[in-house]
Amino acid sequence: MGKSVVILGAQWGDEGKGKIVDLLTDRVKYVVRYQGGHNAGHTLIINGEKTVLRLIPSGMLHPNVTCLIGNGVVVSPEALMKEMGELESRGIKVRERLLISEACPLILPYHVAMDHAREAALGKKAIGTTGRGIGPAYEDKVARRGLRVGDLFNKEAFAEKLKNILEYYNFQLVNYYKVEPVDYQKTLDDVMAIADVITGMVADITTILDTARKNGEHILFEGAQGTMLDIDHGTYPYVTSSNTTAGGVATGSGFGPRNLDYVLGIIKAYCTRVGGGPFTTELFDDVGAEIARKGNEFGAVTGRPRRCGWFDAVAIRRAIQLNSISGFCMTKLDVLDGFDEVKICVAYKMPNGEIVEYAPLAAKDWEGVEPIYETLPGWKENTFRITDVNKLPQNCINYIKRIEEVTGVPIDILSTGPDRVETMILREPFAA
């Protein structure tokens, strides 16, 4: 019987989802992206070769897998063609194995221009977007003025819609933000030059998935960013513009929610965050700097340094609630090697003295929050590339077990290095 498994970030993104998607892809027929855009950098290291995929599902490196981009994904034609070109130059057949929903909103140059203009205007209060036009494209979707992949089939109608929407954007860019307008003809010409390639990959994603389920095929849904960046449930307004939680699978692909069998939450052995927003366990000392150095904590897309802190079970409990997480995959366990002690945040002390075990929702409610830590003995032994759980140091095993206890969710997969072979599968998600 076929299983449908969701892989998503249970923290603030950058948890190592790409590697785990790639690891489990040899079990499946389809890998599906259901939200986000090319703001998500999924890094894969296979036999020492590094690949960063931003828009195309990570399953593309497996020749027998079909990759689907669902309606919840915002698609930049330029970014898509660039990524396709990079993969095809390595002999990977993309357009024969990539299918796209016609309902995907398009990201066009005016979205990027607006993204940059807004962040510049906000100055120090900037949200910290990737500047790739993701938010403005989602805005257009909700406002029902956006252009979609399906609009590329009718080039005359597309040109007229583009003209109208550019008038709307250029008025704001010029008169409010005092920046240069976006050129209509260049935008139109650039999109039309690649329109036929994109429309050639359009398919009914919902029907494909439903048929696969009925035929007993395994399906893997690949999330982007992380739970605490969800537009509705994250640390608003320091969030992304899509639903990064498991509910986004149904709305972003058209796959019925009752058909999901297992949700794998990816967690680092510590926490990181990029950009602004609350981060209760953030470390500003030498320990934080050492975690960042050992973990090579720089964004795959932006290159920005990530903020680092101890493992936050309070935020994770909220992620468990929001996603119905079946099991965890813990990544970067080896980064904690060598520390005298390691800490787990088990509760928050609110400004009024109240002790809470679940993270607040809005960013404003995190102000003045203090972490309450449990301190455990660290381990000096090297766990890098260990693939036998029985060979892990006892203090490391104790740390893992304690995280399972304070969260109530089993750790089903352990990752001890960037390559997909440097992994221990303790419970198989597709057999759970």
Curated annotation (Swiss-Prot):
Database matches in InterPro entries: Adenylosuccin_syn_GTP-bd, Adenylosuccin_syn_Lys_AS, Adenylosuccinate_synth_dom1, Adenylosuccinate_synth_dom2, Adenylosuccinate_synth_dom3, Adenylosuccinate_synthetase, P-loop_NTPase
Molecular functions per Gene Ontology: adenylosuccinate synthase activity; GTP binding; magnesium ion binding
Domain of life: Bacteria
Reaction(s) catalysed by this chain's protein: IMP + L-aspartate + GTP = N(6)-(1,2-dicarboxyethyl)-AMP + GDP + phosphate + 2 H(+)
Residues bound to Mg(2+): 14, 41
Co-factor(s): Mg(2+)
Sites where the protein binds substrate: 300-306
One GO cellular component term noted in the UniProt record for this chain: cytoplasm
Cofactor binding annotation: Binds 1 Mg(2+) ion per subunit.
GO biological process: 'de novo' AMP biosynthetic process; IMP metabolic process
Keyword annotations from UniProtKB, A to Z: Cytoplasm, GTP-binding, Ligase, Magnesium, Metal-binding, Nucleotide-binding, Purine biosynthesis
EC number in record: 6.3.4.4
Residues reported in the UniProt entry to bind GTP: 13-19, 41-43, 306, 332-334, 415-417
Xref: SUPFAM superfamilies: P-loop containing nucleoside triphosphate hydrolases
Protein's pathway: Purine metabolism; AMP biosynthesis via de novo pathway; AMP from IMP: step 1/2
Signal peptide from the UniProt entry: none
UniProt keyword Lipid metabolism, yes or no: no
Residues of the active site: 14, 42
Matches recorded under HAMAP family: Adenylosucc_synth
Family, as annotated: Belongs to the adenylosuccinate synthetase family.
Subunit and partners: Homodimer.
Name of this chain's protein: Adenylosuccinate synthetase
Native organism: Haemophilus influenzae (strain ATCC 51907 / DSM 11121 / KW20 / Rd)
